[in-house]
Amino acid sequence: MLAVSIKNLSHKINNKSILNNVNFELKKDSIACILGPSGSGKTTLLKLIAGLDKVQNGHILINDQEVSSAKKHLPTEKRKIGFLFQDYALFPHLTVKENLKYPINFKNSIYKIEDIIDVVK
């Protein structure tokens, strides 16, 4: 099981502060629920924990290993982290891969679909 530690995490998107000095710890074998209004940074926080976005300020540790500096060992650890959104929309006429690619087609994304599929495998 994993332990997750967030220390002094701050994150901006387009110069807008999304997360400001967030601190918390999840002990091994724990379950957490992140609640908040739309735009409060829930998805941003989850993307940072999953390594889908780069940490700008602060630290995210999984089993005492820094997420941003542990590219080689964390993929197996990150596979043990899951998150479920309250609302989701899948297009039934698309494959799983096409559903994953859909939002990337409309954004200037730095991510490649193959990288995302590797993370979710």
Per-region residue spans from a language model:
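Short beta-strand immediately N-terminal to the Walker A/P-loop
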Residues: 32-33, 83
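The feature captures the beta-strand-to-loop junction immediately N-terminal to the Walker
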Residues: 35-37
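Helix-to-loop junction immediately C-terminal to a conserved catalytic motif
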Residues: 50
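Conserved ABC ATPase "signature" region
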Residues: 65, 108-121
